[in-house]
């Protein structure tokens, strides 16, 4: 558990991000998924996109909390993950056809996973980091792609795959942060929080 005097609000409903925070002993006091427009600006770089969206999520959550006195001292954490081949963004697929197209694109080549994290401190400071990971997929057969789509594990995930599931077997090589690909880079997140006075290690006590 975190320090009882400190509260962290996670501006996300992602179970993967919540699990990753639990991994380093952090229990968010509140989850606040923010419904924002995630459409890229024309010619926007994937790195810029994830940075912008993570900030928008964090700021939207903080704005929603302003009217609640009990949350005026909360830290707010926003995060957004973007998958790209070069500068081509591979978004969250809504339909099986989109998922199939994404997996065919990623098959046998390298892609980048960018995650932007944004922390809004109790005094309103905004701090940001972006993590980058290079991932290479093996060449996928049509049968593998069809079976993966049938599993449903692509739903709601950037790039139409989740590395922590079946798709972990597709990864030939990974350079950088694994937790970044899952959805929240833990090194960067811990660095951001501790750098702004949030007691990360208070949740590490046995029992």
Swiss-Prot record:
A GO term, aspect molecular function: dTTP diphosphatase activity
- Mainly resides where? cytoplasm
Report the catalytic activity. dTTP + H2O = dTMP + diphosphate + H(+); UTP + H2O = UMP + diphosphate + H(+)
Q: Name one GO cellular component term.
A: cytoplasm
The cofactors required by this protein are: a divalent metal cation
Domain of life where this protein originates: Bacteria
Asked if the keyword Transcription regulation belongs to this entry, the reply reads no
Enumerate the active-site residues: 80
Q: What does this protein do?
A: Nucleoside triphosphate pyrophosphatase that hydrolyzes dTTP and UTP. May have a dual role in cell division arrest and in preventing the incorporation of modified nucleotides into cellular nucleic acids.
Protein family per UniProt: Belongs to the Maf family. YhdE subfamily.
Protein name per UniProt: dTTP/UTP pyrophosphatase
In which organism is this protein found? Agrobacterium fabrum (strain C58 / ATCC 33970) (Agrobacterium tumefaciens (strain C58))
Q: What is the lineage of its organism?
A: Bacteria, Pseudomonadati, Pseudomonadota, Alphaproteobacteria, Hyphomicrobiales
């Amino acid at each position: 558990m975190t320090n009882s005097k400190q509260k962290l609000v996670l501006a996300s409903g992602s179970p993967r991000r919540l699990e990753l925070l639990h991994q380093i002993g952090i229990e968010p006091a509140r989850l606040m998924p923010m419904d924002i427009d995630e459409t890229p600006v024309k010619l926007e770089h994937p790195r810029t996109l994830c940075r912008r969206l993570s900030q928008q999520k964090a700021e939207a959550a903080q704005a929603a909390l302003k009217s609640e006195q009990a949350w005026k001292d909360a830290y707010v954490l926003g995060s957004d993950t973007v998958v790209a081949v070069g500068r081509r963004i591979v978004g969250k697929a809504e339909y099986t056809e989109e998922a199939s197209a994404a997996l065919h694109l990623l098959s046998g080549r390298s892609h980048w996973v960018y995650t932007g994290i944004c922390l809004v401190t109790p005094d309103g400071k905004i701090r940001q980091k972006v993590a980058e990971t290079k991932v290479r997929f093996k060449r996928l057969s049509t049968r593998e792609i069809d079976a993966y789509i049938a599993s449903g594990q692509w739903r709601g995930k950037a790039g139409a795959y989740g590395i922590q599931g079946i798709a972990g077997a597709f990864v030939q090589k990974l350079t950088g942060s694994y937790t970044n690909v899952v959805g929240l880079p833990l090194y960067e997140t811990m660095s951001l929080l501790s750098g702004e006075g949030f007691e990360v290690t208070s949740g590490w006590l046995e029992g």
